[in-house]
Amino acid sequence: MKIRILATTDVHGYISPYSYSDRKLCKQGLCRLSAHISRLRDEHTLLIDNGDSLQGSSLNYYHNLYEKDLIQPMAKALNYLNYDYWNLGNHDFNYGPDMIHQYINDVNATLLTGNAYEHGQPMGCEYAIHHFDDNYAIALIGVVTQHIPVWEKAEHIQNNTFEDAFDYVKRTVEKIKATENVQGICVVYHGGHELHLETNEPSELLTGENLASKMCNEIEGIDVLIAGHQHRSYAVFVNGVATVQPYENAKNLGVIEWDLDTNERTVELLMADQEVDEELLNLIGPEEQRAQQWLDKPLGRLKEGNLLVHDPIDARIHKHPLISFINQVQLYFADKAQLSSQALFNESVGFNSEITMRDLVSTYVYSNTLKALRMNGKVLKEYLEKTAEYFDAEDGKVVLNRVFYDPKPMHFNYEMVDGLDYTIKSSNPIGSRIVEMVYQGKPVEETDEFVMVMSSYRANGGGEFDMVKNCEVVQDIQKDMVDALAEYILAHPVLEVEHQDNIKVIA
């Protein structure tokens, strides 16, 4: 028997084909994948989503802010497309347990996630056996990266625990092989490959966040692995395991063709280049329209110019005024802090001279709050040294460290700090690149004390900023950053940006 598995991952609420920053049509969104799904689907086809549905798009943000008692648009979309199975992703925990519970209840598909527990009970099934007929069946195992506690707000996961994904899959595969009569095993993993697909060399710090390579290389019995989380796009074989990771925002559909008699498998990715499914678009149309009207709501204006990001690399080498402005807002709310730290996210567009909600949600794309941490000069230098890893030197010029864009872009892990002056020498060895660090005209000493405000993600150690995880929390500002930006702009309708050219990056 020949079966087919269709897979999406990291859809992040992108149902419609429009860019929320400028309303332009794009090759993305479930409504562009719908035609592929309809064409390929038959009685021997499974449709699976691999998590990160509830956070991301402006439609999701609007829904979670104003209409959370209604059915989530992504639940409507998954039900319309008749998904068979789905998995939880790390970002699905961003809005707390009530939102997840409602989503689980609203989605008709079977939840696979077995290694995420709530009150000691698995949130999904241990594993699923899908029978195609009396003689053919496959097992499906769903797991999510266990690193969620590193990033997530404690109150959102206070009743949750997360088992090591590799250990869970290994144990479950062994159980299935010993007790079930199936023709194959498919792992649905909201995590990615930690080794280069071609060289098998580490492509990132081996923290356990991503374990797909380890699963493929060390667990005997996996036939298919659907990966996610990394926002990468590939369809390959790893140690004989057919593995696919479709690109985020429903830009790809993963397709696995599988002969259960011979175990021959093929993998490919299809682009979101089909005609828009108008019926699906109409299904979410009223809420989409309300979200668009909200996005165009004017908030204030800049006194001079704009804060648009035209060259994101240069905006990091020479700190963009947009970063100065966001740090200005953070210091406004964290009134006990002298320093503020902020990253320019991967696809931040910046602000027009007339600022709307569309500018805010297209620029600050994550659901972060703020924390102000007390630290000494030693920890501050360690923090800056970590950010300085973003750069390298080549032929006497400042370039980017390859690990921040290959195999996946991670520009969001370069932080820029306002409130002091410092110099990064990118040709120096990692850990010795901060060659000057001055606060109010004096060199910073290891014993000096500071309070620095940063995102909740970073304060929890996200991006391997482990040096701040144990710092005293002076202020915990439970206000979403988009809300904080909007509140500040409404209170200062004609904005003056206090830009400081305080960071030098040299080769």
Each language-model region and where it sits:
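Alpha-helix initiation and N-capping motif
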Residues: 30, 71, 97, 277, ...
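Acidic, metal/ion-coordinating pockets
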Residues: 1-275, 279, 317-323, 328-329, ...
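Glycine- and acidic
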Residues: 17-22, 154-156, 307-316, 365-369, ...
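A short C-terminal boundary segment appended to hydrolase-like catalytic domains
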Residues: 260-354, 363, 460, 490-507
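Short beta-strand segments
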Residues: 49, 140-142, 188, 226-227, ...
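Feature captures C-terminal
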Residues: 2, 14, 28, 32, ...
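Short, compositionally biased low-complexity segments
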Residues: 5-11, 145-146, 293-307, 357-358, ...
